[in-house]
Amino acid sequence: MQQKLEDKHVHKGLRKQMVDLLREKGITDESVLTAINAVPRHYFLDSAFVTHAYEDRAFPIGEGQTISHPHTVAYQTQLLQINKSEKVLEIGTGSVYQATILAEMGARVYTIERQKKLYDLHKDYVFKAKYPTIKFFYGDGFEGLPTYAPFDKIIITAAAPFIPPKLVEQLKQGGIMVLPVNEGDGDQQRMIRISKDANGEITEESFDIFSFVPMLTGKNR
C-alpha cells in the first residue's frame, strides 16, 4: 500500500480514461462505471505498482494473490446486477478493491479471505469509515457464511474447480451468483452466472473466458 494516500487530479483523469476503456470493452452498466470512477484503485496497490494503477492489468498483492484487471472487476459486477442495500457475499477479499466497488454501489458486503496475512491487513482498510457496510471474515470460501445467509448476490473472485453447492444453498430465491469455473486443465475459466428463481430452481449461463488464481479449500495461516 502507499505510505501517503492522495487522490490527485492526475489520478482522477487516469481513472476516467480507464472507465472510457471499460466502456469500449463492452461494460454498459453506468452504475458499475460510476462506482469504478469513484474509487481510487491506486490506494489498493503496493507502491511499486501505483504508477500503473489505471492500466487494465492485474497486480500481485502478496500471498500468491492478485488484484484483478479493472475489466474483470467491471465484468463480474455487471453480471451481478447489483441493487442498493442488497446483501452480497464475496469469496476472496484480496485487496478489498472489489468489495469497495460493491459498497460504493450501495451493497452490504460480507467478504471472506482464507489467507490470514491478507485478512490481518484488512483492519487497516483505508475506507473503513466511508464503507462501514463491508464486513470482513477469515474463513473457507467453499463453506460461505451460513450464519448470515441467505444472500441476494454472491461473487467468487478466484478460479473455482466446480460450482460450490454450499454457496448455491446460501443464495436467496431470486438471487444471482457469479463465478469463474475451471475449463480443461484449469489454466482458464469460464465466467458463469447462476440464477435461483422463486421456486429455488437453478439456471446457469456461460459467458467469456478469464484467468484467475485458484480458489482453495480451508484457511491458510
For the regions a protein language model found, what residue spans apply to each?
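Conserved nucleotide-cofactor-binding alpha/beta core module
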Residues: 81-203
